[in-house]
Design a protein with these regions (language model features):
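N-terminal intrinsically disordered/low-complexity leader segments
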Residues: 1-25, 218-224
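Short glycine/proline-centered loop/turn elements that form peptide/ligand docking sites
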Residues: 12, 17, 36, 42-48, ...
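Generic hydrophobic, amphipathic alpha-helix propensity
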Residues: 25-34, 51, 76-88
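Helix-turn-helix
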Residues: 29, 37-71, 75
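Alpha-helical DNA-contacting segments of helix-turn-helix folds
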Residues: 38, 73-87, 142-145, 149
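Hydrophobic alpha-helical connector segments
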Residues: 71, 75, 89-120, 176
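Short secondary-structure transition hinges
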Residues: 103-105, 121-152
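Hydrophobic/aromatic-rich alpha-helical bundle segments in the mid-to-C-terminal region
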Residues: 139-143, 158-208, 220-224
Length: 224
């Protein structure tokens, strides 16, 4: 999750294409600064002068890369969605799920989603999620990745639960995914829960819940 800045599409509204190395470094510096700042603050609280200082750029250079702060946020969100999609594509495949089997496959999904929502993108995810009702729907790219991930889950574990029929297995796996995403998304904005992502307890709870729901025996350690 900590690779280089991805090449951003030139069709992001208000984001000016960076062609020269200096322009790319300026853009990347501002994006990295924003990713870090959003871990603890809201976008509306970020000052461009502060982002410039952290990134080692000038305020004027901000406007050579981004039309305004809304465009800047679109760039942050695009970078996060591309990075997260790439992570799912490499770490979560139908072949890997078949190798892991029912319990290992469910655990892998919980761990991967937990890792992504606890990564450097956490602040961008939170800000984007809080803007889900905006007219431009900034959450749409993440929703697309979720649909692709669910399809992979179905393909990889479609015959891993023989005690259920094919249709019920698909429905139950869909609910497993809904449960994981719903609980961990809620953790983005609400800390007042008995289990949290910060201490990892919510991941343990989710794994136990999914195994029980899918009729997979708990491990000896989980039964203790």
């Amino acid at each position: 999750m900590d690779g280089d800045i991805l090449s951003l599409s030139g069709d992001i509204p208000g984001v000016f294409e960076a062609r020269q190395n200096r322009s790319v470094r300026t853009r990347d510096g501002f994006i990295n600064a924003g990713i870090g700042a959003l871990q603890t603050r809201r976008l509306d609280d970020l000052k461009i002068v502060e982002l410039a200082m952290v990134s080692g750029n000038s305020v004027g250079s901000f406007y050579t890369r981004f039309q305004d702060k809304d465009a800047y946020f679109r760039a942050l969100s695009a970078y996060a969605s591309q990075g997260i999609s790439r992570e799912f594509d490499s770490a979560f495949t139908a072949d890997k799920l078949r190798q892991l089997g029912p319990s290992g496959g469910l655990d892998a999904l919980v761990d991967l989603i937990g890792a992504i929502f606890g990564s450097k993108f956490r602040g961008v995810l939170r800000e984007t999620y809080l803007r889900i009702m905006d007219e431009d729907d900034p959450w749409a790219p993440f929703r697309t990745t979720a649909k692709q991930t669910l399809q992979t889950l179905h393909e990889g574990l479609d015959d891993a639960f023989p005690h259920y029929g094919p249709d019920e297995t698909k429905t139950r796996l869909s609910f497993c995914f809904q449960l994981i995403v719903g609980v961990i998304q809620n953790d983005l904005i609400n800390k007042n829960h008995v289990f949290t992502l910060e201490d990892g307890s919510v991941l343990v709870g989710l794994k136990q819940t999914l195994r029980a729901y899918m009729g997979v025996p708990l491990t000896r350690q989980e039964n203790v």
